[in-house]
Regions:
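Short helix/strand-capping turn motifs
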Residues: 84-147
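Charge-rich, low-complexity N-terminal segments
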Residues: 3-5, 15-84
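C-terminal partner/receptor-binding element of secreted or periplasmic proteins
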Residues: 140-175
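Alpha-helical interaction segments
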Residues: 75, 89-90, 152-153
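Arginine residue identity/basic-tract feature
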Residues: 52, 67, 101-103, 113, ...
Length: 175
């Protein structure tokens, strides 16, 4: 009987740890709200900005050749480039806001909108994808590149919440 009671207590404790609600916290990626680290107008221009994140994390927004990407900077200062240009070679831009998926006070994933110009001959033709990156002690990397659908945001959150078990889409190279 004591063994059964112990098993029930351990299962209940385990369930409460894993059942902790996942919430969202948002970081603006707008260059007016982020600190400019580098900027030049030479050769089409480039930009690197630092945006405040959560839990000691920061985001670097990087632009070059009319393409943007995000690098996650962990609390120890280690950079984890997400290298959005590996997802699409087309001109693109990150959205105005990044969504951190949080378990308690700890980020477990990041969702960023990536607007992609898929027709070189028609700059007005763009599609809004959602990029999901996992944040784990083992790896911080892109796990999903979700095409637009009616339930786009819901699907991205669902993928983010399960991203810890997903493989990286590609290996990133540290800066």
């Amino acid at each position: 009987m004591k063994t059964l009671a112990l098993v029930v207590v351990l299962l209940a404790a385990s369930f409460s740890i894993h059942a902790q609600a996942v919430t969202s916290v948002y970081t603006p990626l707008d260059d007016k709200k982020c600190k400019t680290l580098e900027s030049t107008d030479e050769e089409g221009g480039s930009y690197k900005g630092e945006c405040r994140g959560v839990g000691g994390y920061k985001l670097h927004v990087i632009e070059g050749d009319l393409r943007q990407t995000v690098t996650i900077v962990d609390p120890k200062g280690k950079e984890h480039p997400l290298e959005f240009w590996n997802l699409t070679g087309a001109f693109n831009a990150v959205g105005e806001t990044a969504e951190w998926r949080m378990r308690g006070k700890k980020p477990i994933a990041l969702i960023v909108r990536l607007t992609v110009n898929e027709r070189v001959d028609d700059p007005a033709y763009v599609k809004g994808y959602l990029v999901v990156a996992k944040i784990t002690p083992e790896a911080t990397c892109v796990t999903e590149f979700l095409a637009p659908t009616r339930s786009h945001n819901y699907e991205a959150r669902k993928a983010a919440d399960k991203s810890a078990t997903r493989p990286c889409r590609f290996e990133s190279t540290p800066d």
